[in-house]
Amino acid sequence: MPFEIHSKEESEKHLIVMGLKHISGNKKWSTFNQSKLLYDFLKPYEKSPREEYINKENELINSLGITKHRLRSMLRVYNLIQLYKLSDYSEQFTPDMVGIFEEIMKKPVLKNWLGWNDSGYFASNKINLERLFSWISKTEVYSEPVDNEDDEEGNDYNNGDDYKELEPIITKSLEIRDLALFIENEHALKVMEDERSLARGLVS
């Protein structure tokens, strides 16, 4: 059976129907899936003139009965998650982490620290973005092998043991609120990173 090719208009109508049911209706999807639907609707217009893109935003919010503030908030979260999925920690993403990304985007001080661009939904400060992702993820650090003079000359150590896994510094959305309190204090951030402890950074 040949694949049916939908026009852009048909695809948009389908997304609106799904949105009425799963965003505005009584069979609501998870925040992530709601955000994905909104993203999918607007994606074809992201390189269009700004006026055309805003018109499609207005069409979407009027059809679904949601506010533009809610629409853009959900798009920020979805796009930040997509950036995480492109990072070195992509395989660690789980739906349970969505609340963390939501809280990040609620904090203007964190958005500023990331150099967040609300027009293109991306972080211009790539170094800080990578640091942030490392705080909410398990990471591996290199461990120097311990010299053992009793070993016979020529013995090789197992390269697989040279790295140790560290647990995430931040695992809960509420912890993002504490992070926002000292995100602009580089000394406190360094303490947090060195100690792998949000609490230690908070009191530094």
Please tell me what each predicted stretch does:
Residues 58-63, 69, 73, 80-204:
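Accessory, typically intrinsically disordered or conformationally flexible segments
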Residues 1-77:
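Amphipathic, charge-rich alpha-helical segments that serve as recognition/docking helices
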